C-alpha cells in the first residue's frame, strides 16, 4: 500500500455531543430547582437491633401503669366486687407480669429459631407454653 501525504485539517473539537436520555436530563434538572431532600432511612433491622439493646439495658417498666391497674381491677371484679389494692401490690403484680412476658418471649424466640425462622408466630408461643407445662 502506498504512503499518502497527510494534510492539515481544521479540528472539529472531538466527538459531537450525544443527546441525553430523558431520565438523565430529568435527574440533572431536579436538584437545581430545589428538590425536596428525602428523609434519612436506616436499613431494615438496624432500628430493631438498637431498640433491643436499649430495652435490654433498661430496668423500667414497659407497660403503662394506669392501663395495667385498670386491667387488674377489671379482672379482680370477676372474683369479688369492691376489692381494694395497695399501690405496692399493683407494682409487684406488674413487675411479675413483665418478667413472665419477657421470659415467654425469650422461649418463643428460641422456638422460632428452631423452626429456622427469625419471625415469631402464635404457634411459637403455643409451643413454648406447652413445653413449660402451662397449657395442655
Swiss-Prot record:
GO CC annotations on file: nucleosome; nucleus
Region named Disordered: 1-43
Pfam short name (any one): Histone
N6-methyllysine found at: 5, 10, 19, 24, 28, 37, 80
Modified residues (N6-acetyllysine): 10, 15, 19, 24, 28, 37, 57, 65
Cited InterPro entries: Histone-fold, Histone_H2A/H2B/H3, Histone_H3/CENP-A
Modified residues (Phosphoserine): 11
Record PTM text: Phosphorylated to form H3S10ph. H3S10ph promotes subsequent H3K14ac formation and is required for transcriptional activation through TBP recruitment to the promoters. Mono-, di- and trimethylated by the COMPASS complex to form H3K4me1/2/3. H3K4me activates gene expression by regulating transcription elongation and plays a role in telomere length maintenance. H3K4me enrichment correlates with transcription levels, and occurs in a 5' to 3' gradient with H3K4me3 enrichment at the 5'-end of genes, shifting to H3K4me2 and then H3K4me1. Methylated by set2 to form H3K36me. H3K36me represses gene expression. Methylated by dot1 to form H3K79me. H3K79me is required for association of SIR proteins with telomeric regions and for telomeric silencing.
PTM-bearing positions, type N6-methylated lysine: 15
Residue numbers of N6,N6-dimethyllysine PTMs: 5, 15, 28, 37, 80
CDD domains in UniProt: HFD_H3
Gene3D superfamilies on file: Histone, subunit A
A molecular function (GO) term: protein heterodimerization activity
Residues with N6,N6,N6-trimethyllysine modification: 5, 28, 37, 80
Matches recorded under SMART domains: H3
Record keywords, A-Z: Acetylation, Chromosome, DNA-binding, Methylation, Nucleosome core, Nucleus, Phosphoprotein
Subcellular location: Nucleus; Chromosome
Residue numbers bearing the Methylhistidine modification: 40
Stated role: Core component of nucleosome. Nucleosomes wrap and compact DNA into chromatin, limiting DNA accessibility to the cellular machineries which require DNA as a template. Histones thereby play a central role in transcription regulation, DNA repair, DNA replication and chromosomal stability. DNA accessibility is regulated via a complex set of post-translational modifications of histones, also called histone code, and nucleosome remodeling.
Family under the similarity heading: Belongs to the histone H3 family.
Subunit structure: The nucleosome is a histone octamer containing two molecules each of H2A, H2B, H3 and H4 assembled in one H3-H4 heterotetramer and two H2A-H2B heterodimers. The octamer wraps approximately 147 bp of DNA.
The protein's name in its UniProt record: Histone H3
Amino acid at each position: 500500500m502506498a504512503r499518502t501525504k497527510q494534510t492539515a485539517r481544521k479540528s472539529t473539537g472531538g466527538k459531537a455531543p450525544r443527546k441525553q436520555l430523558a431520565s438523565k436530563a430529568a435527574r440533572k434538572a431536579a436538584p437545581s430547582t430545589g428538590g425536596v431532600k428525602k428523609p434519612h432511612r436506616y436499613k431494615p433491622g438496624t432500628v430493631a437491633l438498637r431498640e433491643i439493646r436499649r430495652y435490654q439495658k433498661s430496668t423500667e417498666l414497659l407497660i403503662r401503669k394506669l392501663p395495667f391497674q385498670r386491667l387488674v381491677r377489671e379482672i379482680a371484679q370477676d372474683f369479688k366486687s369492691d376489692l381494694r389494692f395497695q399501690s405496692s401490690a399493683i407494682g409487684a403484680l406488674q413487675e411479675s407480669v413483665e418478667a413472665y412476658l419477657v421470659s415467654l418471649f425469650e422461649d418463643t424466640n428460641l422456638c422460632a429459631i428452631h423452626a429456622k425462622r427469625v419471625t415469631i408466630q402464635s404457634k411459637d408461643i403455643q409451643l413454648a407454653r406447652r413445653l413449660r407445662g402451662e397449657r395442655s
